[in-house]
Regions:
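Zn2+-dependent metallopeptidase catalytic core
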Residues: 54-237, 246, 264, 419
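Non-catalytic surface loops within mature trypsin-like serine protease
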Residues: 109-112, 202, 284, 348, ...
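Extracellular hydrolytic enzyme modules, especially secreted metalloproteases
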Residues: 190, 195, 203-353
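Intrinsically disordered, low-complexity acidic/polar segments
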Residues: 114-115, 207, 289, 353, ...
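Non-catalytic C-terminal accessory/binding modules of secreted extracellular proteins
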Residues: 2-7, 46-50, 66-71, 218-220, ...
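Terminal targeting segments of Actinobacterial cell-envelope proteins
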Residues: 1-33, 444
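Secretory targeting and sorting signals
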Residues: 29-59
Length: 447
């Protein structure tokens, strides 16, 4: 056979699939006709402090806000620890989410359940929707092309024999992968594919949709000379949950799970960290557009679209909505520690975010030292006393998280404040940032 063995030490990503569930005024901005909101709404958690009229803060070269990668699985770091690898360069073993990327979809059936569905009908559950999602999110910089094996390949054992479930035992998962590749290898040419989806017959007994996930191999498996470090195992229903394969594809390109999985037996909510914001939190979210931080990490933001604020004083920015396809500043970053930043971006209602509950300026904390599924990103609740879109949001308390005109947020301890001062005719959001010290510190984080 033309493959190396499947090592028993493979590990899964957490898998994004689960059952559907639903102040004192600063000096006026010294730029053109930008309307300032009358007064600012200071949030309850803010420590009030008066903004001075000291030196204007300035945007440093973005290198000052790049977080180093850590040993955390799917680290949110953008560069290697030595700072030698630029944003958009994939870590070792990961493909780059840029340009034309080829994906292969292999369909697996089971001997006790002849499939009733045509493979192309199953493929249509996921494509072209998955490719369209990532093309829109990247502004056309990432183009995913699907190639399918247009027939079912029969596994040697029933699906029930593999005990497929979300918390799949390693031995059962390894047996499934070994059998799948043994069946596929003589029939499929794996050369040239960066992404491989192994899709099980959704109607076969023993196929559990909650088990869909990316499996990271302890050692790459080489198929037709193509080393693959991870495989996407798909066990979805027909039709599937929306955006589920787009979420799993994000893992292939080193994006982490942003939900916070409760301990076994707990009934706590999964979506308390980011709510509807970003596909990697929930594929059911109302605003699944990837965070601008993720777009920077994947190399989709052009030079000049990221601003890094470090020095003390006051500075002003116009933020173009994250989901908009054009140019403009998409990401504002305040360094808060060796492994953490406060990220600021605008969110509108268009593209992948057409169903967003609220628009405005969204703030979130990013930690490069947090594991996937352990809170690497936390959205700042801009309205902690309220919630929104209760009937459709995955986590209503964060559905209205963005700040509106006249509202502000200050880091605990008052090291920095972000204020939304206006909305421009072109849809951009005007933001004022004031820092008291060089490099904001987020109290309780990296202290």
């Amino acid at each position: 056979m033309r493959r190396s063995g499947i090592p028993a030490g493979d590990t899964p990503d957490g898998g994004g699939v689960r059952s559907a569930r639903a102040a004192a005024d600063a000096p006026e901005r010294p730029r053109g006709a930008r309307a300032l909101a009358a007064g600012s709404c200071v949030l309850g958690a803010i420590v009030a402090w008066t903004l001075g009229t000291g030196p204007a803060a300035h945007a440093e070269p973005v290198a000052a806000c790049l977080l180093p990668r850590t040993a955390a699985h799917h680290s949110e770091g953008v560069v290697d620890p030595a700072g030698a690898t630029p944003a958009g360069t994939a870590p070792a073993g990961y493909p780059r989410a840029q340009g034309d990327v080829n994906a292969l979809m292999v369909f697996l059936s089971f001997p006790d359940a002849p499939p009733a569905l045509d493979p192309q009908a199953v493929a249509a559950d996921h494509y072209p929707a998955t490719a369209r999602f990532w093309s829109a999110a990247s502004g056309g910089r990432f183009r995913l092309h699907l190639h399918t094996v247009d027939r079912w390949l029969t596994m040697p054992r029933p699906a029930t024999a593999y005990r497929i479930n979300r918390d799949w035992r390693g031995a059962d998962r390894t047996a499934y992968l070994r059998d799948a590749l043994t069946v596929a290898d003589p029939e499929v040419d794996f050369r040239g594919y960066d992404v491989v989806y192994l899709v099980a017959d959704p109607e076969a007994p023993g196929v559990d949709s909650d088990a869909t996930k990316v499996v990271n191999l302890a050692r790459p498996v080489t198929l037709d000379g193509n080393p693959l470090a991870r495989l996407v195992t798909v066990f979805e229903r027909h039709p599937p949950d929306r955006n589920v394969l787009a979420h799993e594809t994000g893992h292939v390109f080193d994006l982490p799970d942003l939900y916070d999985r409760p301990p076994p037996g707990s009934t706590a909510d999964w979506d308390t960290q980011v709510g509807d914001w970003d596909l990697m939190g929930s594929q059911f979210g109302l605003a699944p557009e990837p965070f601008a931080w993720h777009k920077w990490k994947l190399g989709w933001l052009r030079p000049g679209q990221v601003a890094c604020v470090t020095g003390p004083g006051t500075s002003y920015y116009d933020l173009a909505p994250d989901e908009s396809p054009g140019g403009g500043t998409k990401l504002l970053v305040l360094r808060t520690g060796p492994d953490s930043v406060l990220a600021v971006e605008a969110r509108g209602r268009g593209g992948n975010d057409a169903d967003a509950c609220r628009t405005g300026v969204l703030l979130y904390r990013v930690r490069a030292d947090r594991e996937s599924g352990d809170g690497p990103v936390t959205v700042v609740d801009g309205h902690p006393g309220s919630s929104a879109c209760a009937a459709t949001s995955v986590y209503p308390p964060l559905a209205d998280a963005p700040l509106g005109v006249g509202e502000s947020y200050a880091l605990p301890g008052g090291a920095a404040r972000v204020t939304v001062t206006g909305r421009e005719p072109d849809g951009d959001w005007a933001v004022r940032v004031t820092q008291r010290t060089a490099g904001a510190r987020d109290a309780g984080r990296d202290a």
